């Protein structure tokens, strides 16, 4: 999620300061260094997704897990963003990475694919760790009793939209800000979304789904799977459109497909 992205998470943002030193390197060493930097970013995304899903299991394993899990997830995400925002940009979420791909031309398609792959693999490994903690596979967040899938979709779309919109405004709309502003804002949005019954992260749902398949648990709510898997992407799309509609002209950013000159 973070500075969400945007310095370390983009293709060139985390490397601008080292251009002079890199000019003196041989091409082979320069490429190797570039590879190492990218692998560090991907590993941060993998590790963070793993820890987030594990935090879900740790929260649910406690008595009163329905109340403990949101707090466990929120505190974990706050810490991870603080630790990794200057390395990978702290996306931790495929929906976030897709939004950054739309808003930062330095974040390439290769970056997007590698980030999403790392997040999905991390979520899957975390789900198997959750299996070890719980003694059974984690369940995909079920639909609320008596609520249709289309209504439950709002529980995913709205919190995700608010979270990503807030981060876009903070990161692209302001200059200097307190270092912990983004972790606090993202943590607050995640906490509110978790209590509202939202997953907000397709990597979590994907990992739990794979762990259920591998443990031969066929009792999967397909409607809940689709809502929690694709709802965050819809929320990310609305967040992107909302930011373009309200801020992109007055606080111009180098969008991939649009160019706002600003006032």
Swiss-Prot record:
The UniProt record lists the keyword Transport: yes
Taxonomy, superkingdom: Eukaryota
Localisation: Vacuole membrane
Biological process terms in GO annotation: glycerol transmembrane transport; polyol transmembrane transport; urea transmembrane transport; water transport
Pfam family, one: MIP
Keyword Repeat: yes
Subunit structure comment from the entry: Multimer.
General function of this protein: Mediates water and glycerol transport across cell membranes. Permeable to selected sugar alcohols of up to five carbons and urea. Permeable to methylamine/methylammonium.
Record family assignment: Belongs to the MIP/aquaporin (TC 1.A.8) family.
Domain notes: Aquaporins contain two tandem repeats each containing three membrane-spanning domains and a pore-forming loop with the signature motif Asn-Pro-Ala (NPA).
Protein name in the entry: Aquaglyceroporin
Taxonomic placement: Eukaryota, Sar, Alveolata, Apicomplexa, Conoidasida
